[in-house]
Amino acid sequence: MAYRQILAIVLFLCVFQFLDCTVSSAVEENGTVFVYGRAAVGTIDEDFICATLDWWPPEKCDYGSCSWDHASILNLDLNNVILQNAIKAFAPLKIRIGGTLQDIVIYETPDSKQPCLPFTKNSSILFGYTQGCLPMRRWDELNAFFRKTGTKVIFGLNALSGRSIKSNGEAIGAWNYTNAESFIRFTAENNYTIDGWELGNELCGSGVGARVGANQYAIDTINLRNIVNRVYKNVSPMPLVIGPGGFFEVDWFTEYLNKAENSLNATTRHIYDLGPGVDEHLIEKILNPSYLDQEAKSFRSLKNIIKNSSTKAVAWVGESGGAYNSGRNLVSNAFVYSFWYLDQLGMASLYDTKTYCRQSLIGGNYGLLNTTNFTPNPDYYSALIWRQLMGRKALFTTFSGTKKIRSYTHCARQSKGITVLLMNLDNTTTVVAKVELNNSFSLRHTKHMKSYKRASSQLFGGPNGVIQREEYHLTAKDGNLHSQTMLLNGNALQVNSMGDLPPIEPIHINSTEPITIAPYSIVFVHMRNVVVPACA
């Protein structure tokens, strides 16, 4: 017993020293996290975390920066050990294959009559490239890779095939699905597992480069459903049918979901709420709570459309890179981006969004992995820790105190307790917070609760009756928000020479102590001994 008590004291002193070093120059403010634990407000998929692989060739450049290198579906080094380990760590990772060029891709199936040629840059035509092709040899290699890494694959199909594009971007005609059906059949006959087939990329609403009306898109989606039903008639479960994979517009999505009826399993929208990657004010937006709150409107609107329509589809974020046109170096691939990314994951969960696909797994300046050496960027570790700690049920959570704290709570993945995510967007103030459990709420998550009522919850003791919690404090190396090295409890997260990922280990804190959130830091708090009705 004495040994354990001494060990607990040593651990506490280590934690205290770490926190003291990170906040010594800061002012301190108290706050309270209120968690409504009687019922979940949102439920996410078990494989909620998703990332994208794109089609962009090395010639893809934005604002004079060429950030894609060999990160395309067609040229990515599938033998890279770090890449394989990074995917395996999620067990499984959902990967959505798609992007702008998917709508000018043909598939080299045995019955294809067209030559299989690579994309060629041509700025005078739609999307800036000539038609490209997916060789079936490469498709074989990709599927061997997916099987080896345990990847769950969502494949985005070319939805412009057969249509003509007017000068104003309007796409005329129905989807010619001949090549797509042949590709789907080839995939099934080779026993390649696809979890979902998605129709088109950013063709809904106003579109990006081209657009398809909601009524026609619904007809095309029904045709995709019929193809999937034919090809997979003896397969269970069938792949999902997904669409439209574009930017959210209320009227378009309302019409589409009502007319697509039950042909659709998941409706996908894209999010680039931070604006262009060239914007000099990206960090200001990321650290502004009011700016972060704005995306809640679209989450709420889509949730309501689904609720009030005849569809059985669920909401997904099919692609989200924050800053469009490949992001911004040392921002979207640096520590500061985790404030935006984790806030998005938390907000999406609250509004019952089942899957969230980050643009990208690798490629551009917003990849979870470095494009050239494959080492994980900070957001990779943020996603991995989320995956390990945050369970499927999202709990309504508010914070009373500074507006610079973002707070989210889920039932824990590893226990019947809860995991609280706290992010401090302030650069000088250390926040010392306590957690209280409540059984009533009346306002949205962006507002403070005005009245509280204690819930009946239970706390169970650990060894020797000492109740402990597990904390994961994430900070930037040297306090630099532009750093691409993330510290976990003061230690750098880095792969070793063998390409192995570092262990994700918490510090243990006596649960009677408040939670300390240092300036510009992120804290995951696993409270395995807090039992609330929603998580029981």
UniProtKB/Swiss-Prot annotation:
Q: What SUPFAM superfamilies does the database record attribute to this sequence?
A: (Trans)glycosidases
Which residues are named in the active-site annotation? E202, E319
A Gene Ontology molecular-function term?
beta-glucuronidase activity
The signal peptide, as residue positions, is 1-24
Coiled coil start-end: none
Q: Where in the cell is it found?
A: Lysosome membrane; Secreted
Task: Tell me, in one coarse class, where this protein mainly resides.
Answer: membrane
InterPro entries per the UniProt record, alphabetical: Glyco_hydro_79, Glycoside_hydrolase_SF
List all annotated glycosylation positions: N30, N122, N176, N191, N265, N308, N370, N427, N438, N510
Q: What is its EC number?
A: 3.2.-.-
Q: Which UniProt keywords apply?
A: Glycoprotein, Hydrolase, Lysosome, Membrane, Secreted, Signal
Describe its membrane topology: Peripheral membrane protein
Superkingdom to which the source organism belongs: Eukaryota
Q: Name one GO cellular component term.
A: extracellular region
The record, for PANTHER family, names: HEPARANASE-LIKE PROTEIN 3, HEPARANASE-RELATED
- What is the role of the protein in this entry? Endoglycosidase which is a cell surface and extracellular matrix-degrading enzyme. Cleaves heparan sulfate proteoglycans (HSPGs) into heparan sulfate side chains and core proteoglycans.
Family affiliation: Belongs to the glycosyl hydrolase 79 family.
| Protein name in the entry | Heparanase-like protein 3
Q: Identify the species of origin.
A: Arabidopsis thaliana (Mouse-ear cress)
